[in-house]
């Protein structure tokens, strides 16, 4: 399968065609393959490489970050040590962590100038890999979702995201990056918002962020299921004077239920059903959380804007808001990068729930292809 100018990729045909995926290329690669970084991302990449028959020779970290650590039984090398050890053969590096911090992204790009570097796209949640087989199987749905995009920026970004997911090439990540404030100001016109539902509010950071762009905001309902993050959210709500912040410890889902939740206390804590198989085996603490459809909460409340950043549960949360979306069509900001299916599944679902929505795809700076946002406006 070749993605050419006659397909949905016509808006970025200058970037060339994609005829195979990163995993196929790595299988036939003659250079040693090394991991760049440690943690959950590395575990997922190792598991994928094992399934694909790709050998990982070593693991390295940026110079200054190595202190004798072991990872999967190997001593972690510094980048300088890796370059010295593989001086004759060279090597392929697979980025296995992510960051939005400018200095960290600069370090990543510098490594990419000194060796052959790719950022494999492994799902944040779920077990489905966005490889060439997946792309072929879902091409019609990808095409349909692409056609729902309202502007050229969205279409260009949509195409580049597929190219990145298949190749891991960082050059596809920077063309259309925007700041969150630009999205609030120029796309959402947030200055008109008076009420807001934040699904996945973490410690209140997105309420704080929105208030900069929405001076008329009066009420923010902030849902956060994780107990540690919720404690921070409560403290923020008590201190915020610009609007009324109402914190609620609950999760968003398609129906009322009690689900098992990763009780790790980090920003990516999630419903355990959403975790990938390799991550589930390493979760040590879980708890039961109450989840409910946002529609139940919104029966007697109006909101202008809803944000969905619910760690892989976006589809279920949108289903749980279907009545509000159908009847009132508030502006939506939906995270579209947690699952491999999200790129086409979420636009198609939103169009089904509310055909009047105009759909936009935007991305804020991040390596790899995280912080991909689907914006819906009537």
Segments from the language model and where they lie:
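Phosphate/nucleotide-binding beta-alpha loop and adjacent structural elements of enzyme active sites
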Residues: 1-56, 62-378
């Amino acid at each position: 399968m070749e993605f050419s100018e006659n397909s949905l990729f016509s808006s970025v045909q200058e970037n060339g065609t994609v005829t195979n995926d990163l995993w196929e290329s790595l299988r036939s690669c003659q250079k040693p393959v090394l991991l760049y970084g440690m943690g959950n991302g590395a575990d997922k990449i190792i598991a994928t490489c094992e399934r694909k028959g790709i050998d990982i020779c070593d693991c390295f970290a940026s110079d200054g970050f190595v202190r004798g650590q072991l990872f999967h039984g190997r001593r972690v090398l510094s980048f300088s040590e890796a370059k010295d050890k593989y001086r004759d053969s060279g090597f392929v590096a697979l980025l296995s962590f992510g960051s939005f911090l400018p200095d960290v992204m600069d370090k990543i790009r510098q490594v990419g100038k000194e060796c052959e570097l790719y950022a494999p796209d492994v799902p944040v949640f779920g077990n489905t890999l966005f490889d060439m087989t997946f792309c072929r199987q879902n091409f019609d749905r990808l095409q349909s979702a692409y056609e729902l995009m309202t502007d050229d920026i969205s279409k260009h970004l949509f195409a580049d995201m597929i190219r990145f997911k298949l190749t891991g090439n960082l050059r596809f990540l920077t063309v259309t990056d925007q700041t969150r404030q630009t999205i609030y100001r120029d796309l959402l016109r947030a200055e008109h918002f008076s009420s807001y539902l934040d699904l996945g509010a973490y410690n209140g950071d997105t309420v704080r962020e929105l208030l900069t762009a929405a001076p008329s905001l009066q009420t923010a309902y902030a849902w956060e299921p994780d107990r540690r993050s919720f404690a921070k959210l409560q403290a923020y709500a008590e201190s915020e004077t610009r609007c009324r912040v109402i914190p609620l410890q609950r999760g968003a889902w398609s129906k009322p239920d009690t689900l098992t939740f990763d009780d790790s206390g980090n920003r990516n804590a999630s419903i355990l059903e959403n975790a990938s198989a390799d991550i589930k085996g390493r979760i040590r603490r879980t708890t039961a959380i109450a989840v409910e459809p946002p529609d139940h909460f919104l029966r007697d409340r109006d909101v202008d804007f809803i944000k969905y950043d619910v760690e892989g549960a976006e589809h279920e949360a949108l289903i749980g808001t279907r009545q509000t979306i159908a009847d009132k069509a508030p502006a939506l900001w939906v995270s579209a990068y947690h699952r491999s299916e999200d790129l086409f599944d979420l636009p198609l679902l939103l169009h089904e729930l509310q055909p009047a929505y105009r759909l936009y795809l935007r991305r804020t700076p991040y390596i790899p292809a995280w912080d991909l946002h689907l914006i819906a406006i009537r």
